[in-house]
Design a protein with these regions (language model features):
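Transmembrane alpha-helices of multi-pass inner-membrane enzymes
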Residues: 24-28, 238-243, 427, 452-507
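Aromatic-anchored transmembrane helix interface
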Residues: 88-100, 120-133, 142-166, 184
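Interfacial loop-to-transmembrane-helix boundary motif in multi-pass membrane proteins
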Residues: 63, 113-129, 151, 163-192
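Alpha-helical transmembrane segments of multi-pass inner-membrane proteins
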Residues: 51, 133, 174-204, 222-290
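A membrane-periplasm/extracellular boundary helix in multi-pass inner-membrane enzymes
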Residues: 195-198, 270, 287-344, 364-366
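Long extracytoplasmic/lumenal interhelical loops at the membrane interface
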Residues: 201, 346-415, 434-442
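N-terminal signal-anchor transmembrane segment
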Residues: 11-107, 134-135
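Loop-to-helix entry and N-terminal half of a specific, functionally important transmembrane alpha helix
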Residues: 258, 402, 413, 424, ...
Length: 507
């Protein structure tokens, strides 16, 4: 009887397979016609659009496609197929459409027992989105500028509510963890190719560091910069997870060392100096409880950790000596200090430190209004294919200065102390929530290791705000950031679903 009852579903029919079949047939006919024309870009574009249409009926598949597309495909297209860069926008289009598709499916799925709670860091996120939109149009420098600014800031933020709208499945966490670590591992072959084959081709380009192109799947420009720091941040996120799995007894020493070494190879190759600080942050966050409870054991582990850092330093010194940039460790350390505190970054007059002091001197006390609210989105941009950069603050008043050389300085100039404060509050709230969730799942070692690794990833992201400007426009890095925040939101929802069905806002 139970089987018969389940078989009769109130006359409900699922037409999704028929719709997908129709789209596939229609797409095949259209693709045949376009192939006859012989335009490869038009052909690829049509394939991508039909793939998006089919994925509309499979939002879970679209979710994984956006994650993998943002962390792998988008960066590779930018570096290896720059003529197809427009297709990177498909990641943004998928991220925007995804929450609407999931919400639509949720309306007809009749889910039971799922919490409607949401973490408090989402309030800070929503406040930043609302404030940025308000700033874009009140401090408007034209509709195109406002729309471009909002697109650059929030092009993949649709992934954040998507994590909350995903229906709970027991295999989701394992699948996500597998994907995260797999993407970390596949950075290795790409980094090796970029180091041995692409970096030497950049040796003669003025004001360009050859090793910056070693960015794995996070992309770069053969004639400009690369997202090597973004790849380093992602690799340390993966390393933090591996350390957590080892600490919780899920990995043996040999496997832990092998995985850590594999994940660290791209970081060694791309010479990202901030990796030293990333490593310290990861170590402290993952082992914070042990540091507080057993300082002596921490000192012992710290000796090993310092030895690893020393290996990093000596490798970088060796590479620099062989490229005739410096001679000896002392000169290398002097170069680091000069590069970050005294000399301009690249071709700019300002560097990561002086861009902040310059912002302060330009606003306090003579322009407190713009210090609070900023000058408007895109005002630190010095190049764009869609907006007349001659009207931006960076091009009009501060040409060649580099006022947006980091995300922190860029946020201060564009959305002021209010906007920058909302971003900091967002990450602080998420960091604290990760700590609480990790304490709540002591009996679930895989879950705790993943959450603790995410907490370390958030710490790395906060530091990155003062190191690079990627947070404000780079789709690959933004997918990584939203992955961290979205996973925390998902875990929060799972905890609340296990406790209560009543709406709540905590965290």
């Amino acid at each position: 009887m139970a089987m018969n009852h389940q078989g009769m579903h109130s006359g409900h029919h699922d037409y999704t397979p028929l719709l997908i079949a129709f789209l596939a047939v229609a797409g095949g006919v259209l693709l045949g016609m376009i192939a006859a024309i012989g335009n490869p870009i038009l052909l690829i574009g049509t394939i991508a659009l039909f793939a998006m249409a089919i994925l509309a009926f499979a939002p879970r598949l679209l979710f994984w496609a956006v994650l993998a597309g943002g962390l792998v495909v988008a960066g590779l297209i930018r570096l290896y197929l720059p003529q197809l860069q427009a297709f990177r926008w498909l990641v943004a289009a998928g991220a925007i459409a995804l929450p609407f598709m999931l919400a639509f499916h949720a309306m007809f799925s009749h889910r039971q027992g799922e919490s409607t709670s949401f973490p408090s860091f989402l309030i800070w996120a929503a406040a930043f989105v609302a404030y940025s939109a308000l700033s874009a149009f009140i401090l408007s420098h034209g509709w195109a500028s406002a729309i471009l600014g909002l697109k650059d800031y929030f092009q993949v933020w649709g992934l954040l509510p998507a994590f909350l709208l995903l229906p709970a499945r027991p295999d989701f966490r394992k699948t996500l963890l597998t994907l995260v670590l797999a993407i970390g591992v596949i950075q290795v072959p790409f980094a090796l190719h970029q180091y041995f084959f692409l970096a030497p081709l950049r040796a003669g380009i003025p004001s360009v560091m050859p090793a910056d192109i070693v960015a794995g799947t996070f992309g770069g420009d053969m004639n400009g910069g690369g997202n090597n720091a973004a790849m380093a941040a992602y690799q340390f996120f993966c390393i933090a997870i591996v350390l957590g799995l080892w600490k919780n007894g899920l990995l043996g020493v040999r496997r832990m060392l092998a995985l850590t070494a594999c994940l660290a190879v791209p970081v060694f190759l791309n010479e990202t100096k901030v990796s030293f600080v990333f490593a310290v942050l990861v170590f402290v966050v993952v082992y914070w409880n042990e540091i507080r409870q057993n300082p002596l054991r921490f000192i012992q582990a710290g000796v090993i950790f310092v030895a690893i850092l020393a290996t990093f330093v000596m490798f970088y010194v060796f590479v620099a000596e062989n490229t005739d940039r410096i001679h000896g460790l002392d000169q290398y350390l002097d170069l680091l200090v000069e590069h970050n505190l005294f000399r301009g970054y690249g071709t700019y007059q300002l560097n990561r430190a002086t861009t902040l002091t310059f912002w302060f001197s330009e606003h306090v006390p003579r322009d407190l209004f713009h210090a609070l609210v900023g000058h408007g989105l895109t005002q630190t941009r010095e190049a764009s294919a869609f907006v007349d950069i001659g009207t931006t603050l960076a091009a009009r008043r501060y040409a060649g200065m580099g006022i947006g050389v980091t995300a922190l300085s860029g946020l201060l100039w564009e959305v002021g102390l209010i906007g920058a404060g909302l971003v900091i509050a967002l990450f602080v709230s998420a960091f604290r929530l990760a700590g609480k969730l990790a304490r709540e799942c002591r009996d679930e070692p895989i879950r705790q290791a993943f959450i603790k690794g995410t907490q370390a990833g958030i710490a790395v992201t906060v530091l990155s705000l003062a190191h690079k400007s990627l947070f404000m426009f780079e789709v690959t890095y933004q997918v990584f950031v939203i992955l961290l925040l979205g996973y925390l939101a998902y875990e929060f929802k799972q905890f609340r679903s296990a406790e209560t069905r009543q709406p709540a806002v905590i965290g």
